[in-house]
Swiss-Prot record:
Belongs to the herpesviridae TRM3 protein family. It comes from Human cytomegalovirus (strain AD169). Interacts with the terminase subunits TRM1 and TRM2. Interacts with portal protein. This is Tripartite terminase subunit 3. The active site is at residues 310, 463, 534, 651.
């Protein structure tokens, strides 16, 4: 029989072999440590009591005699032999009496058992251990592990968001029966009690996207997540796909290094064929690392978590393999990438901004509200609202911005800031709700009971076009009035010249005057007319159009007619309006008013050039729908346009925008009698 010190040495030797990367296949179970032997088969024997042992044990007669004396031959006498008890023990047992359990006590125990069922669940214990170890790592508790782990770590909000996405989905799929109770525990642990149930449900989605600026620790944070999941989640399968092989190999080595130096004493860590596995003696937890050039390696896998790093630069052919895991209800796919807006091919994930469910998470130094103003200011390096802050290890100033743009124009916004230019450009300026409300809700301006609430002044804006090309441009005319804090459209005209042989000024003036006279005839409460004729194209023609309109209107009505006046090159006030930088301000003001429901149309809207073929409001809505913002280059002022390729021009919407813009009292001083 082996002595005690020999058994201890064998046990120690066996533990060393287990920790090695490759240990002999002849290692037997630790259940028979006293008889473990690594000798050749010719020297081995199989004994009923000792199991697999060295044949030299047959020479120890006391050992053989002991085994023979206590050998179990399954004889009936052994099972029927009477057990002997001490008399005092028998008398003490006879005096024991048991009281029946009351119903209240039984119900209390059942309730307590139901409440503690979650905490006894093995899957919950795995999640709880993961949370405990991760918190310990954040607090710097692993002092003997990887360099830097001894320091306390403060997570960025997107990193905490990523961690919540991972653990929430695993909790729901691992413990579906107790999912609600697990989520309540996680909500308390992450201190996100302020979130609504709708926001909580986002964490349980099968796919999510994170767009984060460069150098913010995206890949760095993935490494501890994979490591601690392998340690605590028994049987989990993780996939990691990178855009380059050297990136996936780097993450593989870092995960292996962390696993071996953090918890290799308790578990066997193995690295084979780009797969890191940890043996939990009941099941293995594995993590496979691949590049987008070898996505065939992830085919046929049964991942619970699939991390796609730098997803914007993944080969499009590889996405077919990755997206195939969406059909698996136990797989969570997380796309992580840096924000890059240089070309459409490297920012295709921004299309998810218009997805019916929230799955796009964008981190930027500049919020979307101030992005365009930030772009127009050449020296700005921080958002005006200061809602988003940069980490301490990121240094941004005007010199960095200038230097980056000197190497490559626009590099600061595209590569460093991580702007959301593509998202903002694709964002619709006019909401669907406001367009539907504008189309359906129209006021009756002939209702005599409402005369006292309508404004008494009619504003008309005329944008003349001296061409017969219907695809290029036409004359837009809009008549707008006030109703309390809202604006009413009384008339719309979109006029095109038939040919260049006729007098363009006369034709345009007659069209506008005809509409104005009709509006004034239908609405007798209007007692003042203010007209602005755009003179950017031809100032002389604009003055002549103004004179012709005044002559036609005053010959039919006795209303007071005022024109917007602008000084010409000789500093003489002339009846025309010059559109300049205030166009962008007017458009932004119109968008705000339209989306807020302050722009309405009259049921008795007057139109002689549109009504014959279209509903004037639907015709106007087509141009409103095309309204978009165009940013030419960084440092330049953005402009707005409603022109689209192969679509109608934007003359009518510009006339409506400027008419509502000139309704403000600040412009009243510019209207005078001509």
């Amino acid at each position: 029989m082996l002595r005690g010190d020999s058994a201890a040495k064998i046990q120690e030797r066996y533990a060393e072999l287990q920790k090695r990367k490759s240990h002999p296949t002849s290692c037997i179970s630790t259940a028979f440590t006293n008889v473990a032997t690594l000798c050749r088969k010719r020297y081995q024997m199989m004994h009923p009591e000792l199991g697999l042992a060295h044949s030299c044990n047959e020479a120890f007669l006391p050992l053989m005699a002991f085994c023979g004396r206590h050998r179990d031959y399954n004889s009936p006498e052994e099972s029927q032999r009477e057990l002997l008890f001490h008399e005092r023990l028998k008398s003490a047992l006879d005096k024991l009496t048991f009281r029946p359990c009351s119903e209240e006590q039984r119900a209390s125990y059942q309730k307590l058992d139901a409440l503690t069922e979650l905490y006894r669940d093995p899957q919950f214990q795995q999640i709880n251990n993961f949370m405990t170890d991760f918190k310990k790592w954040l607090d710097g508790g692993f002092s003997t592990a990887v360099e830097g782990d001894a320091k306390a770590i403060r997570l960025e909000p997107f990193q905490k968001n990523l961690l919540i996405h991972v653990i929430f989905f695993i909790a729901v799929t691992k413990i579906p029966v107790l999912a609600n109770r697990v989520l309540q525990y996680l909500i308390h642990a992450f201190q996100i009690d302020f979130l609504s149930q709708t926001s909580i449900d986002i964490f349980k989605q099968k796919a999510t996207v994170f767009l984060v600026p460069r150098r913010h620790g995206k890949t760095w944070f993935i490494i501890p997540i994979i490591s601690f999941l392998l340690k605590h989640m028994i049987g989990i399968s993780i996939g990691y796909v990178a855009h380059q092989k050297h990136v996936s190999q780097f993450v593989l080595k870092e995960v292996e290094f962390r696993c071996r130096h953090t918890f290799a004493r308790d578990y066997v860590v193995e690295n084979k064929d780009n797969v890191i596995s940890i043996d939990h003696r009941g099941a293995k937890s594995t993590a496979l690392f691949a590049s987008c050039y070898n996505t065939n390696s992830i085919r046929g896998q049964n991942f619970h978590l699939l991390l796609v790093d730098e997803a914007h630069f993944i080969k499009k052919e590889a996405f077919n393999t990755i997206l195939g895991f969406l059909a698996q209800n136990t797989t969570k796919i997380i796309f992580i990438s840096s924000t890059n807006t240089t070309s459409d091919s490297t920012c295709f994930l921004t299309r998810l901004n218009n997805a019916p469910f929230d799955m796009l998470n964008v981190v930027s130094y500049v919020c979307e509200e101030h992005l365009h103003s930030f772009t127009e200011k050449g020296d700005a390096t921080a958002c005006p609202c200061y809602r988003l802050h940069k980490p301490t290890f990121i240094s941004l100033n005007s010199q960095v911005r200038k230097t980056a743009n000197m190497f490559m124009p626009g590099a600061f916004m595209d590569e460093i800031i991580g702007g959301t230019n593509k998202i903002s450009q694709n964002t619709v300026l006019i909401t669907d709700q406001s367009r539907e409300e504008f189309d359906i809700l129209r006021y009756s301006t002939l209702n005599t009971n409402a005369y006292d609430y309508f404004g008494k002044t009619l504003y008309v804006y005329l944008d003349p076009a001296f061409t017969t090309n219907r695809k290029a441009s036409g004359t837009g005319v809009a008549a707008v009035g006030a109703y309390r804090h809202q604006f009413l459209i009384y008339g719309l005209e979109h006029f095109f010249l038939r040919d260049l042989s006729e007098s363009s000024e006369v034709a345009i003036a007659e069209c506008a005057a005809h509409m104005i006279i009709s509006v004034l005839s239908l609405h007798p409460y209007l007692d003042e007319l203010r007209i602005a004729v755009e003179g950017n194209t031809n100032q002389a023609a604009a003055v002549r159009i103004a004179c012709l309109i005044r002559q036609s209107v005053q010959s039919s009505t006795l209303i007071r007619v005022l024109f917007y006046h602008t000084p010409d090159q000789n500093h003489i006030e002339q009846p025309f309006y010059l559109m300049g930088r205030d166009k962008a301000l007017a458009v932004e003001q119109f968008i705000s008013r339209f989306n807020s429901g302050y722009i309405k149309a009259s049921q008795e809207l007057v139109s002689y050039t549109i009504k014959l073929s279209h509903d004037p409001i639907e015709y106007l809505l087509e141009q409103i729908q095309n309204l978009h913002r165009v940013t030419l280059a960084e440092g330049t002022t953005a402009r707005y346009s409603a022109k689209r390729q192969n679509r109608i021009s934007d003359d009518l919407i510009i006339a409506v925008i400027m008419a509502t813009y000139l309704c403000d009292d600040i412009h009243a001083i510019r209207f005078r009698v001509s």
